[in-house]
Structure formats: C-alpha cells, structure tokens
Amino acid sequence: MRVAPPYVRAAGRFEAQLSVLTGAGNMGNYNMHAVAKVIHGGKAYEVPVLTGNALKHWHSVYLAEVYQDLGGTQLNEFCKKGVGLRGKNMSGEDASSEAEAIKDLCNDLHGFLLPDKQIKRDSLVRVSFAVPVLEEKNLEAASKFAVVHNRVDPFKRTQQVKSKEEQEGTEMMVFKQEYSSAVYGFAAAMDLGLSGVPLYQEGESGVDDRERALRIKSALVALLRLFNGVGSKQARALPIARLRELVIAISDSPIPNLVHGAYPDYVARSAELLTAYLKAVGKKGVVLCYGVDCPQSNNVLECKKADTLDDLFQEALRRALPGGQPARR
C-alpha cells in the first residue's frame, strides 16, 4: 500500500456508567449486554465490552455530522443517516468502481465491499474493542447487571376481562435490560492521507486537496464526540461517561499502532515502540497527551502534554492537516 501522510494513532481511557455499550440480543424479555473474556495475571475475566464494530459505527455517524457541520457535501443518503450500507455511489446505487464509491465520505474513510462486482476498499479507520482496564481492582469491579423496566399498555384488557362491555383495564409489560459500569481502554488507527485515493483500482476520485483536508479534519474531530456518545439504547440509557485520558500520535511515516489503553503502562510502552520504529526508519513523529503524563522527548519523537482537550486537538489538527488549520468548505 502506498505511503501517504498523515498517519494518526490514538489510545486512551474513558469511564462509562449505567450504559449499554453494545447490545447482544435478547432471550424473551431479557436484553443482554455484550461480554468477552480477557486474561490478566493468569486469570480469565468475563467483562462487558464495546465491540470494535460498534465503536467504528459511532465514529462514522459522528464523522458525517462533523463533516456536514464544517460545510462538507460529498456524502450519500446512507452516510447522512448513519446507515452502514457501504459501496453505494452518490445516487445510492452500487458503485461501478472504487474511484466512484469514494466520492462519498463514508465509503472513503470506512471502506466497503461489493462482492458481486469484486470491488473493495480497506477501511482507513480501524478501531479496537474497548475493554475494562487490565488492573485487578477494575476487572473485579467491572460489572453488568439487569434493571427491570415496565411498560404499560392502557388499551390492552387484562386476562380476566372477557368482553368489551366489561370494565377495561391495563396490562403491565415487564422487561429486563443489562447495563454495565467500568473504566475502559481503547485504541484506534487512521491512515488519513489515503483519503480520496483509490487503493486497488486505477482512476481519479475527483476528491481535491481542499476536500481531502476537510475529511481529515472531520475524522479527527469526530473522536471528540465518540467517547461521550457511544452505545445502544441511548434513548433511555445515554451513557454517564467521561474521557479520562487520550494519547494521539501523528507522523508522516506509517507508524505502529499504539499500545491499547487497557494496559496500565500503555503510554510508556507506546512511546518506546514509536521511538524504536522511527529510529529504525529514520523518520520523526509527535505524541500528544491529555490527562496523563507524557514521556520525555527524544531526537525522533516529540512528546507534548496538553492541559485541555482544546489544546490537544488544536495541536493535532495543526500537525495533521496539510498547511495547518483551517479546513472548511
């Protein structure tokens, strides 16, 4: 795959209380939360998780909203509505080529597959599962639990009522929903310089430099929306959430992914990994930290701590965008 900067990597932690980060189906009137097993200290823990599929979906939703807010217009109806039906052109029909498909924002950044036409595009945005931080106390405290909810149908007669002429009653419909509470780690990788560039087919997409810069900015800013607004059942269980820590690495070189935020030493290990790689290839990069101490800079890796999220994202946008800020239609 061709090299096209910027390459952005992110990792961090967020706290979510009383949330349904990913639903996992139901048994009758019992709605379940997705769980998975992680290993720590030689022990297996079954923990609530936010799947990478769900995290990627929410990034695409917020990407489209941010992009339109910044004045972007090149997205089809599926992308506008947050429907993950990829591979459609701007008219909503199956695209005839990769170049045609990536005129649409969501196809471009989140990829697609049209098996009947043998057309595909790898996602430029890749995300991990979000799992509870791998510390014994947090893993033991991470929990999912069921809450009983009631719905009342005022028009449905009770079973004892035999005829319409008799007194009408109401019927209570009980269901249970699983929720979770924990501190979660996450990781993401975005090869944003390949926006608007066909990966597997010849041809021009018509995505100019200004449009490409707008898409890069939208993808980065969408991260701000992500960790306070993910999960299913949001109509009645908007997550009680906050971002605790965020680390963003940016380079003109295709750098390794950061160590997942679930690991206790993810910041130091990420800096160690990036330093080793950048020295080996003779390139440079920057790491921006929020909510956590940044390692010391060295001759290939600049490390900067941001006191606020605004400081972090202004610096990230300055580093990632061609010619710096701003990008707006």
From Swiss-Prot:
InterPro entries cross-referenced by the UniProt entry: Cas7/Cst2/DevR_sub_I-a/Apern (IPR002764), CRISPR-assoc_Cas7/Cst2/DevR (IPR010154), CRISPR-Cas7/Cst2/DevR (IPR052681)
Pfam family, one: DevR
Keywords from the UniProt entry: Antiviral defense
Superkingdom, natural source: Archaea
GO-annotated biological processes: defense response to virus
Regulation: induction: Repressed by 5 J/m2 ultraviolet light and 50 mM NaCl, slightly induced by 20 J/m2 ultraviolet light, 100 and 150 mM Nacl. Member of the csa5-cas7-cas5a-cas3-cas3'-cas8a2 operon.
Keyword Methyltransferase: no
Similarity section: Belongs to the CRISPR-associated protein Cas7/Cst2/DevR family. Subtype I-a/Apern subfamily.
Described function: CRISPR (clustered regularly interspaced short palindromic repeat) is an adaptive immune system that provides protection against mobile genetic elements (viruses, transposable elements and conjugative plasmids). CRISPR clusters contain spacers, sequences complementary to antecedent mobile elements, and target invading nucleic acids. CRISPR clusters are transcribed and processed into CRISPR RNA (crRNA).
Subunit-structure text: Can form a Cascade complex with Csa5, Cas5a, Cas3, Cas3' and Cas8a2.
Protein name according to UniProt: CRISPR-associated protein Cas7/Cst2/DevR
Organism: Thermoproteus tenax (strain ATCC 35583 / DSM 2078 / JCM 9277 / NBRC 100435 / Kra 1)
